[in-house]
């Protein structure tokens, strides 16, 4: 059952798979065996965002391709535990996608491998399925990630625009963010990092404050660019902003930080909060996430988040 019927209803389409994260013990030595340990948990940009949105009190539904294997069952159990209504396309003879990341001893990403072939089967035709059409009708807001094929993202953007429903996107990677290029007419907001913004626009910003103008020239109505510990840049049709993220004592694991920022910012925007305050909530949740060994906060962290938002600086208007 969907919770909190009066809250915004958010449909998420995209990645829901297993994350395998290895952390190196000591300095990273390329082209050599490094001592370390592995941790395994459900992940995926869309799924991380969906679970954070549910923890923040929203009614959330998730659509994603999945294999008929133990990993698929683990993802389904995680959705149930998080309060996300799970509507997967299950391919019994296929393997659930997976993401393997190697992190330095300071929690920074060294390299990652994405085994995501199954997502290619989420074709535009899938959007015509009765269950998907019902979920689109149900939703007040839609979020997708770039694990979906380019044609599917474009078709979803057209559908969202025709239905008058806000659509936000998560870039996932510099290679995959290109899948949003043909969807800009129906895309209201795109969450990305600096490398993804450069790939999407085909340009480099000599000054981070140039990103709003560069991305508007690409047709984007709104977006946010995170840059690790440096200023977050965000814009919409009326704002161009820079926000200094709150300091983090110890970075444990950066996995999921961008998804957390997207979820908390979208949560605020969907509730009617203006962009300057929405990105403060996003920055607060991202800082909590990098301080944790998990990609998604527990529901019990909501009170901590409220307190932390109050400690985040006000954003600055860009000239």
Question: Regions from the language model: what does each represent?
Answer:
Residues 55, 220-229, 246-318:
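Conserved post-catalytic alpha-helical subdomain immediately downstream of the catalytic base
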Residues 65, 91, 101-141, 146:
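Conserved phosphate-binding/catalytic loop of the ribokinase/pfkB sugar-kinase fold
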Residues 51, 98-102, 111, 231-235:
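Short beta-strand scaffold segments in enzyme catalytic cores
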Residues 1-65, 70-81, 244, 251, ...:
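Glycine-rich phosphate/adenosyl-contacting loop at the front of the ribokinase-like
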Residues 78-94:
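A glycine-rich helix N-cap at a beta->alpha junction
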Residues 9, 140-141, 189:
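Structural motif
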Residues 157, 161-166, 171-242, 250:
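Conserved phosphate/ATP/ADP-binding segment of small-molecule kinases
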């Amino acid at each position: 059952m969907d919770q909190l019927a009066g809250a915004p209803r958010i449909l998420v389409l995209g990645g829901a798979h297993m994350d395998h994260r290895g952390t190196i013990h000591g300095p990273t030595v390329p082209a050599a065996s490094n001592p370390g340990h592995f941790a395994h948990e459900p992940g995926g940009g869309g799924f991380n965002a969906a679970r954070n949105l549910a923890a923040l009190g929203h009614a959330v539904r998730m659509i994603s391709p999945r294999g008929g294997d133990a990993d698929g069952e683990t993802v389904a159990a995680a959705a149930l535990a998080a309060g996300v209504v799970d509507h997967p396309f299950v391919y019994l003879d296929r393997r659930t996608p997976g993401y393997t990341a190697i992190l330095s001893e300071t929690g920074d990403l060294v390299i990652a491998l994405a085994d995501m072939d199954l997502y290619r089967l989420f074709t535009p035709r899938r959007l015509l399925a009765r269950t998907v059409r019902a979920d689109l009708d149900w939703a007040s807001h839609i979020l997708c990630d770039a694990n979906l094929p380019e044609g599917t993202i474009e078709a979803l953007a057209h559908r969202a625009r025709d239905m008058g429903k806000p659509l936000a996107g998560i870039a996932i990677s510099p290679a995959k963010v290109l899948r949003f290029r043909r969807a800009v007419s129906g895309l209201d907001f795109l969450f990305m990092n600096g490398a993804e913004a450069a790939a999407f626009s085909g340009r480099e910003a000599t000054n981070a404050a140039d990103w709003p103008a560069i991305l508007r020239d690409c047709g984007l109505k709104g977006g946010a660019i995170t840059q690790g510990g440096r200023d977050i840049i965000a814009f919409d049709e009326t704002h161009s902003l820079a926000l200094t993220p709150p300091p983090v004592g110890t970075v444990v694991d950066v996995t999921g930080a961008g998804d957390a920022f997207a979820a908390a910012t979208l949560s605020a925007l969907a509730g009617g909060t203006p962009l300057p305050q929405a990105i403060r909530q996003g920055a607060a949740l991202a800082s909590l996430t990098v301080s944790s060994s998990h990609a998604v906060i527990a529901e019990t962290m909501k009170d901590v988040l409220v307190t932390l938002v109050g400690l985040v600086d006000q954003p600055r208007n860009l000239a």
